[in-house]
Amino acid sequence: MASAATGVGLREATLSGLGRVPRELPTVWLYDARGSQLYEEITRLPEYYLPRREREILQTRSPEIADRMQARTLVELGAGNARNTRFLLDALAPTLERFVPLDVSQDFLRSTTEVLTAEYPRILVDPFVGDFERDLDSLPAGGPRLIALLGSTIGNLYPAQRLRFLRAVAHALEDDDAFLVGIDLVKDIARLEAAYDDRRGVTERFVRNALAAVNRELEATFDQRRFVYDAHWDAEHEWMDIGLRAQQAHTVSLRRLELEIDFAEDDPLRVEVSSKFRRAAFEREAGAEGLAVESWWTDESGDFAVALMSARPA
């Protein structure tokens, strides 16, 4: 995290985000080594249904995906521990030569690589430390490639970011490549809010860890005691709005940005959004950026979807 955090790009993104209304921190601050560990703990929480629903789909559909793709290279964007990816690795084993897990956390990626190299000795595990929004064009060639973005990570992108990302994916795909994406669907608000405000407070610790990372890397003075956790449904944008809210008026300094921020009581600090999708709207959005949905699978409850996509002919 330290090398990434001191980079000009993240400093500029942080400066820009803190100048918006509401103030925002780039999501990448969540994923230092501690944050990555906390996120993996979140994926095991009973309230956080997303990985279980996605697992149900991949367990059932991975053989079909493998039959259609015959992929030689599997790329996973934001790989984490690649838990659900194992269904794809198993199904693609007859043709797969290389797995490229991409993640911003070098330490976490190293651990994942060691485990997968032992589990899949016939597949070259070729880790890539980076940000999938910026580094898509730097990924290894050698198709057919299946590029996967699982866990509804696509929902963490703001609409303009998401459009740019989908456009970049369409541009990166060769004729025999495909894009596989996990998508959380709109559902009961109480279930959504519970998923991001669990009883054990793990998600709150995950979000607060972003402040700790900013304090460490940017010599900032965020005081955890002056903020309360806030995760709520935004009906207008159809996303979960996740972050913190100032309990009292105070000033925060970010020495490495040469910045001071005045928070009024109740001012929000957004750390993440998690958009929820409807099929028709998602297909229109992707189609406008050059991607066609070839298959759309949901879990039995209709909570979650996995879409297999290809680039539309120019």
Predicted segments with their positions:
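Conserved beta-strand signature within the Rossmann-like core of class I S-adenosyl-L-methionine
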Residues: 171-186
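N-terminal auxiliary segments of SAM/dcSAM-dependent transferases
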Residues: 1-29, 36
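Glycine-rich SAM-binding Motif I of class I
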Residues: 82-86
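Substrate-binding/catalytic lobe of Class I Rossmann-like enzymes that use SAM or dcSAM, i.e.
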Residues: 191-275, 279, 283-289
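Class I SAM-dependent methyltransferase Rossmann-like catalytic core
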Residues: 22-71
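A short, conserved alpha-helix within the catalytic core of class I
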Residues: 156-168
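Conserved class I S-adenosyl-L-methionine
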Residues: 71-80
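Class I SAM-dependent methyltransferase SAM/SAH-binding core
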Residues: 89-134
